[in-house]
Amino acid sequence: MNSSSHNPAAKSGNKGRFLPILQVGDVLLSPDILTECFCCDLEACGGICCVEGDSGAPLQPEEVLHLENTLPAVEADLSAEARAVIAEQGVAYSDTDGDLVTSIVDGRDCVFTCYDKNTGCCYCATEKAFREGRTQWCKPISCALYPIRERRLSNGLSALNYHRWSVCHAAVRKGNELGLPVYKFLREPLTRRFGAEWYAELEVLAEQVLADEI
């Protein structure tokens, strides 16, 4: 889901000093992606990020087709309300900011959410189908990259910011307990988005930045 936008301060959590914006290839990064910790804790939050927010999950135009192609495999997992919304307006719409996002139910749930009958935990139906080998596509990259938000700039570069959201306080706590930086938690989707070579360069940069902070 897409919550209100936030431009985090480039401030190190270790020494409290401000760090410059970093760059790896054609990607600008807020340094707190390297210095802050995060690890999703579904048992604690119940998957609330798929429910809360003021619009659906941000989409790339090509991802609409992926969602449409995935729909037959996941439709049975969706609520009747979600299926009705999809039948009426499709899997995506343009929100009040003009951004392409997933359709939502009653201003809350992404239409691709499903719930565990025993725990009540909310899951992504497309990711569930992918993990079970029923589809070849996992989920929108904006969902996979969270809590990183990507913004494409007019000069051709991409900008990555660490998005702080109050519903993810349990993930911050768990990340700190594990000592797991945001960029390591998101190794798989970052590699999927920018490539293995890019991620390897990010790891080298992270080692340099974090060494300077010790």
What does each model-found stretch correspond to?
Residues 1-214:
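Short loop/turn segments that flank or connect secondary-structure elements
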